[in-house]
Structures are given as structure tokens and as C-alpha cells.
Amino acid sequence: MKESIRSKLENLVERLDEVNHLISDPEIINNQNKFRNLTKEHSQLTPVVETFNQFIQNQGDLQEAKDMIKSGDPDLKEMGQEELPELEKQQATLEAELQKMLLPKDPNDDANIFLEIRAGTGGDEAAIFAGDLFRMYSRYAETMRWQVEVINSQEGEHGGYKEIIARIIGDGAYSRLKFESGAHRVQRVPATETQGRVHTSAATVVIMPEAQDVEQIDLNPADLKVDTFRASGAGGQHVNKTDSAIRITHIPTGTVVECQDERSQHKNRARAMSLLASRIMDERQRIHDQEIAQERKSLVGSGDRSERIRTYNYPQGRVTDHRINLTLYKLDEIMQGGLQQVVDPLINEYQAEQLAALSEDSA
């Protein structure tokens, strides 16, 4: 293990000791914010320190096995030779685990998200595909026990959506889906195609972390144009009787958001403000990510929304993620919500990039 990494881990051991003392201090206990922040830090530090302690213990056992091999006693030498391979394997595993634990954590990883899907080239078929993608993400959310709330949608003429915006609420939603942003392409024979020809259509996906605190995003009320209008679509007797739908325009950036899913204008306004704040925060973060990606030549977290990231080929039953050259012949399974088969390799690739960067910084 590199000295710089070991030093970081030793500092974390000291910090955990300090946090242990602080959370038993009556003054801290009476301060809810401080106590909550410290208990959160305690829960983050504990697994790292426990793994580091295992690493140190294993290192001692490893040295002991080497000393046994060097000793003149044949029995001890044999015992040491038997133990050494397993101890070396454990040491390598623990070191790799510790390096992953030291990777910088994205502060938005635990956030809820806004999912935006827009039909691209391909007309009606693109809208149908946008609907298929929304169903895929909704089913994946179900498997993760997340909640999905539709904020706004514009249905396609022959099914699917020209645009749909949803909020996904659940632990780790952003950490799991943040690499889904980009252009998704589908190759298949549309239901309306009489000649059996394969058509190519596309939809764009945007994943944004929900702003934790709308007030933290500097939104000057003078920069906002708020319009109310009557909600359209299903809703029975309540439709078109009140101006409950909300449209907010952020004048400096030209960003426009709408929310008409709730019957209450107050609720629609709150949701629209949350979406607007998240979009503005996301745009700032995207520019930042692009700058870092250019420096690091990152494949996964590039922040480029126009990049074609994935192809869904129905005749071949194939899904290909172009960023990491991943091809899976499990299209039906993935479209039914088995998205972890794509998500996990993307996260692993991103962590590998981060580890490479950590090694460079520690060199």
C-alpha cells in the first residue's frame, strides 16, 4: 500500500476516535443538526476503519507466515507455506476494498432524481420508444423499492410519449441512474411497417439530482415568470375547471418548466420550483463534469447529453452500451426492468477511472 493512502486511512482512524467522543458530548446531543451530521459521519467512517483494522491484522499474520518460512523449523516452514497464498489473497482484496472506500463520494449520490425522456428522431416510433424507456426505468425503480411520480407528460399520437418528466424517490436513486443521461437509439420493425424493414429511432434521457434545498439555489424572484393554465389530459370532473397547472420561466437562462400533475396549484408550483432549481443546479454541475472529463479523458461521467450512449437492437435481442463496449443479448430482460446488468458495469468502470486518478494523485 502506498504511504499516501496509508496516511489518509490513519487520519480517518483518528477522526473516528474524535467523532466517538463528540457524539457522547451532552452539548452536541442537544444540537440536533450537529448530532445528525456527526452520526452520519460516524456511519460513513466506521466501515472504512473496520476494514483498515482487518488489513493491519492480516498484514501482521502475513509477516508471521513469512517469518515461519524463513525459520529453520521444517514444520513451521510448511505451515507458513500453506498459509501464505490465502493471506496474500486476503491482503490484496482488503487493499482494493480500502482504495474504493477512499474514492471521493458524489454528494448527490443519495439524492432523489428527476428523469426526463424526450422522443428524438423517428416520429411516432420515437415516442413509442420513449414510452418503453419510461416503463423500463419504472420497473427498475420497483425492483429497487423506489417511488415514481409523473410531473408532466405529453403523449404521442400512437402511444408512448413525446416528452415525460418524472420524479424518482428512493435511497441511492442518483448513484444508480446518473450514467443514463444521453441519446438512446432503438433499431426495430415498427408495428406500422408493412414491408418488415428495420427502422432506427432515438430518445434522449436526462437524469438530474433533485435539489436538496431549493432556497440554496440562488433564484431571484424577479428572474422568474410564472404562468398558470388549465391542466390537460385525464382527470374527470376536475379537468379544465381551474387554472391549477403551472409554468415557470427562468428568464436569464430561458429554462422553462411545467407541472400539471397535481390538482392543487400550490403543489404544482412547489414541484415546478424544485424541478427548476434542479435543472439550474444540474447545468452548473454538467459544465463542471465536462471540464473534469476533458482533463481525465473520462468515458462514463463525461456529462455530454448529446452523446449516443446505448443501442437497443430488437431483431438481435441486443443491448450495447457504447461507452464501455458492453454488449448483452438480454434485451427483453433489460426492458422489463433488469437494468442492473447495465448499471453495475458502468459503475465499476467509473470507479476504475476514479482509482486510476487516485493513483495518479498519490504518485
UniProtKB/Swiss-Prot annotation:
What protein does this entry describe?
Peptide chain release factor 1
Q: Which UniProt keywords apply?
A: Cytoplasm, Methylation, Protein biosynthesis
Spell out the Gene3D superfamilies in the cross-references. Answer: 3.30.160.20, 3.30.70.1660, 6.10.140.1950
The GO molecular function terms of this record are: translation release factor activity, codon specific
**Gene name, Swiss-Prot/TrEMBL:** prfA
Matching HAMAP family: Rel_fac_1 (MF_00093)
Q: Which Gene Ontology cellular component annotation is one that this UniProt entry carries? A: cytoplasm
Query: What are the subcellular locations of this protein?
Result: Cytoplasm
NCBIfam families tied to this protein: prfA, PRK00591.1
Mark the residues carrying the PTM N5-methylglutamine: Q237
Chain's role: Peptide chain release factor 1 directs the termination of translation in response to the peptide chain termination codons UAG and UAA.
Write down the InterPro entries for this protein, in alphabetical order: PCRF (IPR005139), Pep_chain_release_fac_I (IPR000352), Pep_chain_release_fac_I_sf (IPR045853), Prokaryotic/Mito_RF (IPR050057), RF-1 (IPR004373)
PTM comment text: Methylated by PrmC. Methylation increases the termination efficiency of RF1.
Q: Which organism is this protein's natural source?
A: Hydrogenovibrio crunogenus (strain DSM 25203 / XCL-2) (Thiomicrospira crunogena)
Which family, according to UniProt? Belongs to the prokaryotic/mitochondrial release factor family.
